[in-house]
Amino acid sequence: MWKEKVQQYEDQIINDLKGLLAIESVRDDAKASEDAPVGPGPRKALDYMYEIAHRDGFTTHDVDHIAGRIEAGKGNDVLGILCHVDVVPAGDGWDSNPFEPVVTEDAIIARGTLDDKGPTIAAYYAIKILEDMNVDWKKRIHMIIGTDEESDWKCTDRYFKTEEMPTLGFAPDAEFPCIHGEKGITTFDLVQNKLAEDQDEPDYELITFKSGERYNMVPDHAEARVLVKENMTDVIQDFEYFLEQNHLQGDSTVDSGILVLTVEGKAVHGMDPSIGVNAGLYLLKFLASLNLDNNAQAFVAFSNRYLFDSDFGEKMGMKFHTDVMGDVTNNIGVITYDNENAGLFGINLRYPEGFEFEKAMDRFANEIQQYGFEVKLGKVQPPHYVDKNDPFVQKLVTAYRNQTNDMTEPYTIGGGTYARNLDKGVAFGAMFSDSEDLMHQKNEYITKKQLFNATSIYLEAIYSLCVEE
C-alpha cells in the first residue's frame, strides 16, 4: 500500500530534491548577517523548504532565519521530525559539479543527497502524502529544519530557546532500522603558545601549515610552506620516499624560494577517523624529520606525541570502551600554523556513556602545559540514549520491518544527530544496510530506490504514530 502511494509522487520527489540540492548551502561566516545568520546559502535552502510547503498548503514558522518548521496534523502531542539543509563543503575530486545535481537512471548525485537533503525531502513527502489522503490526525507534526547542523548547531540552540519541545521525534539523518543512542560529542582546540625566538639559525623554517575545513571531517589535503636554507634536493627526495613508504599521494614544488609540500589523504566522517587517512597528521610526521625552528619543532612534535595514529584517544590517555556505545574516537579535523601566531589543532572527540569527560580533559590539559599548549573547550553534547524497547522506538522499527523484512535490532552510533535535542528522540534512516556511505565525501549520491523506499517507510511510521490510536 505505502510503496504504491509513493510511486504516484516519484517525479515530484525528484524535482523538489533537485531544487534543494542546487543550493550551495555551506556555512559562510564571512557573508553572515542578521537575515542570514550562517550565510546566504543555508538561508536560501531554508526558504526553499518554506516555498514548497506553502505551495502544498502547509503552515510554516520561521525562527530568526536560522531554523524553522513546517506544521501539519492536530492534537495535543507533537511528533518532531528534525532535519537539516546545510551541507559540508564539497571538497575536490568530484566527477561532476556537486551543486548541479546529476540524475541517472538509478541515482541522484550531488552534495547533500545523503546528508541530509535527500532524507529531508523523503520525510516531507511522507507528511504531504498523508495530508493528501485526508487522514484523521491524532498528533501534530513539526518538521523542524535547521541550517547549522554540520558546524555548531546554532539553529537548534536558537529554535528550542523559544519553540515548543516535541513530545517525541526522529531525525532522518543516519541509518535504518533505528539508532537509539549517540555518543557524547565535543569540539575543542589545542592552542600552541608562542615560544621564545631561536637561539641558533635553524636549517628549515615552517612558514605556514594548513589542513582541514571542518572538525567533523578527516582532512584529505594538507599543505606546508617551508623555508629551506640548504639541501633542498635532499628534502624533496626524502619527502618522495616518505610518500612511497606510507602509500600516500603528494607533491612538492618551489614557489619564490619556498618549498611547498602537499599530501592527499582520505576524507571520511569524523565519527570514525580510523577508516580515513588524515593528510595533515601525515605531513606533520614528515616535517618532524627536519631541523625546524623552535616553534614549528614543538608543534610537529606535539602532533606525533599525542595525535598521530591515535584515533581512539590512546596517546591522549582517553582510551575507553563500553559494550553499548563502543570506543572513544578522536578526530583531528583542522590543523593550522603560521610563523607569526604559532599553531592550532581542532579536535572532534566522541565518547560513550560512562566516560568521565571532565576529569579526562582536566588531566590532559594539565599535562600538555609543559609542551606549550592549552585546551580551549567548545560545545559539549553529552551522550543521548532512548531504550530500544520503548513503544515509540518499536513503532518505527515495525514500519521498517514491514517493508524490508529485515529484523536487524536498533543500535547506537558515534555520530550526532538532531535526535539528541529531544528527551525521546532517535535517528531513523535514511540509509539502508546496502547503501554506499559517501556522506562528507566526493561523488555523494542516493539511489532512487533508497529515496523512495525511505519515503514509504516514513509514510507508514508517521501514520502509525500520528493517525492510528
Curated annotation (Swiss-Prot):
A Pfam family assignment: Peptidase_M20
Active-site residues (renumbered): 86, 149 (proton acceptor)
Keyword annotations of the record: Dipeptidase, Hydrolase, Metal-binding, Metalloprotease, Protease, Zinc
EC top class, as a word: hydrolase
Molecular function GO terms recorded: acetylornithine deacetylase activity; dipeptidase activity; metallopeptidase activity; zinc ion binding
Any single biological process term in GO: proteolysis
UniProt keyword Zinc, yes or no: yes
Cofactor(s) it depends on: Zn(2+)
Binding site for Zn(2+) 2: 84, 115, 173
Membrane-spanning segments: none
Note on cofactor: Binds 2 Zn(2+) ions per subunit.
E.C. number: 3.4.13.-
Binding site for Zn(2+) 1: 115, 150, 440
Family membership: Belongs to the peptidase M20A family.
Name by which UniProt lists this protein: Putative dipeptidase SAS1677
